[in-house]
């Protein structure tokens, strides 16, 4: 049976994107803990912290951002870059925190070297900039001018902090205001001056110095560890500073592995250092000064008692190097600390309340939420759980990241710890010691297999309902990286215990393939194993690296794809080769068995293939091949990618008609099913193919680098692509919506065309012109105007012949005027239709002032440039027609002159008088 292509168009649209927001550098948060500002290379990104929604992405100036900050009131964003420029943006937040309008209000060059640190005071009016050459300036944010210049040291400024030493006294005085007489205006002014005189700026340097600048006196005061010997506060970078108005104490943290509390005594700052075993990157006061926190290279957030200077968090082991903390910021009034890690993850911690802070010890702090700033290079991804609400990502690291892809969105103001939104980080699967390269999942979505560069494969048990994410078994035996793993996907009977409780029934076996060219089959134990699981069967499979594995739907066969340009089909029970697929000219990167229930597929020769089924392969030769598993021959080759094909997946088959009356009708319905698959390549494109026609149905483009992985939602046909650009794109199948919209538009078009015919037939030119413009029918519009202009009985006072048409022309929108000018331009190029065009153009010029045409606002047009081109074309042809008419007039005088000359040469006229002919006098 010949395959006939359906007219339904296949379309996909971007439904969601998980994309990077932070790739190292500065992190800032407003006072309401709602707007997170992060550095993304040359760009600044603003994100709503509760919902994870990206509110704005601010383009850079071509150079990487050196530092940024946001004011506590979220009124301004300040961005400094390596180009030595500082840009100040005014922020306008929507009431529902759904978007932010960032307006550039000022660009300046603050220093001769890059600005490396910024600080804003609590009133959001003052900004301090610290440069790499040690220069410090204080700015008025709104005014954009420098208020103070600090003569700092000639070394890099590493920390800045505004504080007010009179804040505590002001609070106490405010409590007693009701019991005192009202101050006079002079007293209030004096009080304001007193408060202003207490503003200070503390700064730390790369060589361990701490200085305090008095904004009122414009003086700088040193802070020495030993005032007598003038030994500096620290021996290395001062990374963080904070001030407690309750204690009148300054806190500093340094990479010399110390943090110090400085108290004002006897006219000088005296410090009490607390030795630590890690470089300190961030410190601060919590709970009105009763607690201190510190964070550093160990990746731990520690709490300290301010009075005893002792750590109150229980002993904890240092975390991995990737989890070391490089910076932190705290909002004590929100009991929140946000830590930035080396792997570009933002970890959010809840700090103890005032009541809990009185305890002498507390359990180690763990983040209640993680935000992946970037997922780095995404090597593989799979859907998890029966409802496909989680996704596992292999992200060029030793940990597997689990993210939420559920449709649920948090409500405004929902600050529940761990509240899931789309793209929210749920958990990390830790266990591998090197980069995870491949993933696979069983039928239930609760069991995940992984292969890594540590030469092992692991099986993970995922149970988010009980917050359980554990490694079930470790499989060793390979001597090189495990680049491919596969699990059987046989669905057990619905009444079986394995179907009802999949968490208690792991898959039967696991297949792994490695760069050591071996494939191994491992029988999975029924109980969790602490040690390594031995290999059941092992075979030397290929001559080069094994790139991909796939198990057939019934579990009886599996396929291995290799860099040796071949794909081998194996018996799963015996690990014996049953067939070899040869034909690719380069290494094979991906392989995928057709799903169960696949209809017969038509090959290039026109022969329908069913039987044992078919299999897809994608290769470095830029082609995809469809193979017959009955005789292992190539049925069809698909060409279209411009680079390596790295992943192929079958799309879900459309459901056959349920109302088929007999088996023959059901078979016919199944035969008409559209068989499609998708591919992802190193050309950063996703292509959807028709398996029977061998043609591309559509091409999807939303990535900037090679795509390593592609998967499909088993129920909705949602495609998910990921690759080297750190972006995960979710493509929604909109074919049904597109078909419905096209059908509706076609039906509406037929109705409108019939209505237009009715208007023309009835002579309702007013309605006909409006509809013809709407439908963009230039031929019919010309016919209407021709009838109007050439009417035998033009109405008196009408510009074009009929006053109703004049009224229509005088009430056109900008888009309609522009469209009509386009049509007049085309008609004006033809001498036959030019008179009609000139008449209508004359009517338009009379009906509208000149500024109407010069200020046309048209969507889709290239602005004034496009309008100028149209008017210029009208002018050129109008001048040509005018010249032609002038020449015709001149030629008409020649005819008159000729006739006159002919009259002069004629004999005198003969006049008849009284019946006689008499010659007239000459």
Language model regions located:
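Intrinsically disordered, low-complexity acidic/Ser/Thr/Pro-rich linker and tail segments
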Residues: 1-56, 64-67, 73-98, 159-221, ...
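A structural motif specific to WD40 beta-propellers
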Residues: 15, 53-56, 97, 103-106, ...
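WD40/WD-repeat beta-propeller blade N-cap
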Residues: 16-23, 59-65, 108-115, 150-157, ...
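Loop/turn segments within WD40 beta-propeller blades
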Residues: 26-33, 68-75, 112, 117-125, ...
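Conserved strand-to-loop turn within each blade of WD40 beta-propeller repeats
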Residues: 39-40, 80-83, 130-133, 203-207, ...
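WD40-repeat beta-propellers
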Residues: 44-48, 86-91, 136-140, 210-214, ...
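Blade-level signature of beta-propeller repeat domains, shared across WD40, Kelch, NHL, RCC1
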Residues: 708-739
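Extended acidic/polar alpha-helical scaffold segments
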Residues: 798-922
